[in-house]
Amino acid sequence: MVRYSKLAFRQLVRVYDVDVCFTPMIYAKNFIESEKCRSSELSVCEGDSPLIVQFATDDPFVLSEAAEMVYKCSTGVDLNCGCPKHDVRSKGFGSALLSKPELLADMVRQTRARIPDPDFSVSLKIRINHDIEKTVDLCRKAEAAGVTHLTVHGRTPSQRAEPIDIQALRIVKDSVSVPIIANGGITTREEALFLAEQTGVDGIMAANGLLDNPALFAGHEHTPSDCVENFMRLSREYGLDWLLYHQHLQYMLRPVFSAQQRRVFNELNGRLAIDHFLNNLLDI
């Protein structure tokens, strides 16, 4: 998730049965060249594990260099090959890479050569192609290059809210031997279990669903009040920017706000005002 899966939020979802966390997508070249980028984009703590750092690049050397820089503070790197946003695609990153399976295989190969540690994962996050055989070919090339696992979003780059393609996910799972993580449209624990049962995949990733409900995988239908309280505490502890703090809470509390409460909350300015509003709302 671009911007959102910072340290405080990762530590929050770990409380509610998330097994592995990913960082926000980070531009690998900026990360290598800028100390400011590294300090703002990647903060970790002792309990922030397993952690996979997700990068955006189209350069095998840059990916392997960035991977080496995070080797000691993470459990793996992931290359974003699925982001459909125009500003990402225009750089040749994200889903623009799906048409270049040989390049992706080379990026995996060079990164694995730089870090041969089998406990450090090198993975790809992709979207499916309208021609599923092209997706299978990409996955097989990545597998041959040494990819640790693949996260497959069950929509094409041009799709947004359409139902995910369960059959396509099943075909990909049956075509390779590396673990497959399915992604797309998960909003409840029941949906995650159903998708795993229908496709046989090895794991389920949620993104937007966790923004709305960080306790999703623990079986909560909506964000429970203790989750909000935990997020308030963790955000203070890890210094989460108040604007991002505000945005997270807008997602989490959307189902419980009245229209009037939503208008008031959206106009709040600063952490103190936000916390005062929440203390009254939650009777903390």
UniProtKB/Swiss-Prot annotation:
Catalytic residues (positions): 83
Name its species: Caenorhabditis elegans
Sites where the protein binds FMN: 54, 125, 153, 183-185, 207-208
User: Top EC class per UniProt?
Assistant: oxidoreductase
Q: Which cofactor does it need?
A: FMN
* Gene3D superfamilies documented for this protein: Aldolase class I (3.20.20.70)
The family note in this entry says: Belongs to the Dus family.
PANTHER family for this protein = TRNA-DIHYDROURIDINE SYNTHASE (PTHR11082), TRNA-DIHYDROURIDINE(20A_20B) SYNTHASE [NAD(P)+]-LIKE (PTHR11082:SF31)
Q: Which GO terms describe its molecular function?
A: flavin adenine dinucleotide binding; tRNA dihydrouridine synthase activity
Cited Pfam families: Dus
Instruction: Supply the name of the protein.
Output: Uncharacterized tRNA-dihydrouridine synthase-like protein C45G9.2
Q: What is its EC number?
A: 1.3.1.-
Does the record carry Oxidoreductase as a key word? yes
Q: What keywords appear on the UniProt entry?
A: Flavoprotein, FMN, Oxidoreductase, tRNA processing
User: Domain of life here?
Assistant: Eukaryota
Where do the TM regions start and end? none
Query: InterPro entries, alphabetically?
Result: Aldolase_TIM, DUS-like_FMN-bd, DUS_fam, tRNA_hU_synthase_CS
Q: What role is this protein assigned? A: Catalyzes the synthesis of dihydrouridine, a modified base found in the D-loop of most tRNAs.
> Where would one find the signal peptide in this protein?
none
